[in-house]
Amino acid sequence: MEHIRTPKVENVRLVDRVSPKKAALGTLYLTATHVIFVENSPGSRKETWILHSQISTIEKQATTATGCPLLIRCKNFQIIQLIIPQERDCHDVYISLIRLARPVKYGELYCFSFNPMLDKEEREQGWVLIDLSEEYKRMGLPNHYWQLSDVNRDYRVCDSYPTELYVPKSATAHIIVGSSKFRSRRRFPVLSYYYKDNHASICRSSQPLSGFSARCLEDEQMLQAIRKANPGSDFVYVVDTRPKLNAMANRAAGKGYENEDNYSNIKFQFIGIENIHVMRNSLQKMLEVCELKSPSMSDFLWGLENSGWLRHIKAIMDAGIFIAKAVSEEGTSVLVHCSDGWDRTAQVCSVASLLLDPHYRTLKGFMVLIEKDWISFGHKFNHRYGNLDGDPKEISPVIDQFIECVWQLMEQFPCAFEFNERFLIHIQHHIYSCQFGNFLCNSQKERQELKIQERTYSLWAHLWKNRADYLNPLFRADHSQTQGTLHLPTIPCNFMYKFWSGMYNRFEKGMQPRQSVTDYLMAVKEETQQLEEELEALEERLEKIQKVQLNCTKVKSKQSEPSKHSGFSTSDNSIANTPQDYSGNMKSFPSRSPSQGDEDSALILTQDNLKSSDPDLSANSDQESGVEDLSCRSPSGGEHAPSEDSGKDRDSDEAVFLTA
C-alpha cells in the first residue's frame, strides 16, 4: 500500500473504444492487487477489475479539455482508457501503477496473498492432482529400453531440469555427465514422450557446443543410445527448430548444431522458427491492427499479413506435424533442440505430443502436458511473461503461440478435444495473472526454493473443480477424431489458419457475439440429454405397461376356459348381457376360476388401481393417447356403479387404452 499515492479518484470516465461517446462515469480505486472502476449508474454498479500483474503498459496521454487520458494495455489483450479530471490525480495514478505493475520480488505477487478459503489439506491435494510419475507409467515406462535416472538429484547436473529424468538404458552416468558438459546450459538429451506402439520417442535438449569443429564422444554415445532404444529404426532425426542461418551464426560463438560426420546414423532437419525477439515484434504488430477503431477489411487483412503472426504459427505447426509423422508413420525417434531448449523446443514437443496422443486432448491430459513439457523442463515463465521487473527484451509470447496452435487444431478437429476455447483462454489469463503458483519462476529448482506449493494454490485444482465450464459439447470419446494420431497436411499456404478473435478481441463488446457458439452448443447438448432421459423413462414405463397388458390377456384367456367347478354353463346364451341380469345374484358369481392362482389375480388392474398406482400416467392418459376413457362414464356424464360386466368391459377397454 505504500506505493499507492491516491487510492480513490472520483468522476473518472471509462471510455468505450467501440463507441467513444458512451463513456461510463464512475470512481477509480487502487488496491494492493487490483485497479477497480465502479460505475455510478443508478441502475447497476458495474465493476471492472484489473490485476496489477496483468498490466503490460501504461501510457499517459496529452491533457485535453475533458481531462487527462490514461491508456492501460493488459497482457490478456484488454485495453482500458480512462479520463481523469485532474492532471495531478492522473499523474499519481500513473506513478502508482508503474510501480505496482512491476514488482521487484516474488513475495509481492498476488498468489502469495490470494486466499480461496481452502484448508491446508485441500491445498496439498490440489498440487498432487497432476502427477508426472503416473504420466510416465501411462506411457509404459520404465521398460527394457528406458530407465529412470537420478543423475540430476538435487539439480547437480542441470539446474533447469527436473530431478527425475528418463534416459536410454544404455546411457551410463558417465555418458550423461559428459553429454551435459557439451550442451548449452548443460541441458543434455532426455526423454519427452514415448510412443509405445512402436518404441519411437521424442527427446529434447539444447544446442551442442560444437562450434566449427569441436566434438564430444559422450554426446555422440548419448545419441547412439537413443537410437538403440528404438529397435525398429536404424537412425534418429535431429530437428533444429531454428532457421539455418541463425544456427550457423551460433557456430561463431562456439555453439551451433550437430555435425553429421561425427554423429553416426542421424538425419538433420532445420525447421525455421524465429527467435523470441521476432515473435515479440510480430505480436505487437498484430495487436496494433486489432486496436484500429474502424479498419476496412483490406486494411485489417493487410496488417495481419504484414505482422507475420500466422506464418509463425504455421512454422510451429509444421514442426509438430513433421515430428508426429516421423514417430507414428516412420517409427523413428526424434531429438529436438533450439538454442537453450526451453522455448521453441517446448512448443514443438508439446504440439507433436498433442497430435500423437489423444490423452493430451482431454482436460486433465492437457494439464499434464503443460506440467511436463513447460513447467518441469524449465520454461522461463518469469522472464518470458514479465512477472517481475526485468529486461523487457526477454519477454516473448512463447506459450501464447502454443495455446493458439492448440486452438487452430480445435478448429480443424472440433470433435477431438474434450475441452473448449474457454479452457485455453483461462489458462492464458492465469499465466499472466500470478493468482496461482504454477507459472512462477524459471525452473523447478527456483519453485522448490520459494516453497511455492506450501505458500500458494494450484491452478489445475481450480480448473478441475470447474471442469463443467470447459467441456466441449462436440467431443465424443468413441469418435474417430479422438482415436490415435491427428493427421494434418504440411501444405505451403496459410488458409488453414485463422485469426483468433476470441482471444485477441474478446474484450471488444461490439465485435463479439452475445452468445458464444460453445455456450449455444452446450445448451443444446444439455437439452438433448434431458430429452433423452425423459424418453428413456417413458420407454421404461411403456415396457411395464406392455407387461401388464400381456398378463391381463393371459388372465382373461384363463377366465374364458371351461371351469369344472363353477356350475355355470359356458354357452354364450347362458351369460347375461347386462349388469341388471346379475342383480341380486352378485355374491354367487365367481370373480375368478378356482384354478387361477393368487398371483394372477394381483395382475388384474381396474381403472381405479391404474390411477392409484401411477398418478402421472392416469392424469395425462387422455391427453397423451388422444382416446377418452368412456368405459366408466354414463352418457349423461355420471359414473356407473361397478359390476362384473363393467369390470370385464373395462379390461378390454383398458387393453385398447394401453395399446394406444
Curated annotation (Swiss-Prot):
Query: Which processes are annotated in GO (biological process)?
Result: phosphatidylinositol biosynthetic process; phosphatidylinositol dephosphorylation
Superkingdom per UniProt = Eukaryota
**Keywords from the named record:** Coiled coil, Cytoplasm, Hydrolase, Lipid metabolism, Membrane, Phosphoprotein
Q: Select a single GO molecular function from the record's annotations and give it.
A: inositol bisphosphate phosphatase activity
Q: Where is the active site?
A: 338 (phosphocysteine intermediate)
Record carries keyword Membrane? yes
Could you say how this protein's activity is regulated? Interaction with MTMR9 increases phosphatase activity.
Gene3D superfamilies the record matches: Pleckstrin-homology domain (PH domain)/Phosphotyrosine-binding domain (PTB)
- Name the InterPro entries for this protein: MTMR7_PH-GRAM, MTMR7_PTP, Myotubularin, Myotubularin-like_Pase_dom, PH-like_dom_sf, Prot-tyrosine_phosphatase-like, Tyr_Pase_AS, Tyr_Pase_cat
Stretches of the chain forming a coiled coil according to its record: 514-558
Q: Where in the cell is it found?
A: Cytoplasm; Endomembrane system
List, alphabetically, the CDD domains matched. PH-GRAM_MTMR7, PTP-MTMR7
Q: Which SMART domains match?
A: PTPc_motif
Where are the bilayer-spanning segments? none
Q: What is the predominant subcellular site recorded for this chain?
A: cytoplasm
The signal peptide here is none
Q: Which GO terms describe its cellular component?
A: cytoplasm; endomembrane system; membrane
Tell me what reaction this enzyme catalyses.
Answer: a 1,2-diacyl-sn-glycero-3-phospho-(1D-myo-inositol-3-phosphate) + H2O = a 1,2-diacyl-sn-glycero-3-phospho-(1D-myo-inositol) + phosphate; 1D-myo-inositol 1,3-bisphosphate + H2O = 1D-myo-inositol 1-phosphate + phosphate
Q: Subunit notes for this chain?
A: Heterodimer (via C-terminus) with MTMR9 (via coiled coil domain); the interaction enhances MTMR7 catalytic activity. Does not homodimerize. Interacts with RAB1B (in GDP-bound form).
| Family, as annotated | Belongs to the protein-tyrosine phosphatase family. Non-receptor class myotubularin subfamily.
UniProt name for this protein:
Phosphatidylinositol-3-phosphate phosphatase MTMR7
Starting at the broadest rank, the lineage of the source organism is: Eukaryota, Metazoa, Chordata, Craniata, Vertebrata
> What gene name does this entry carry?
MTMR7
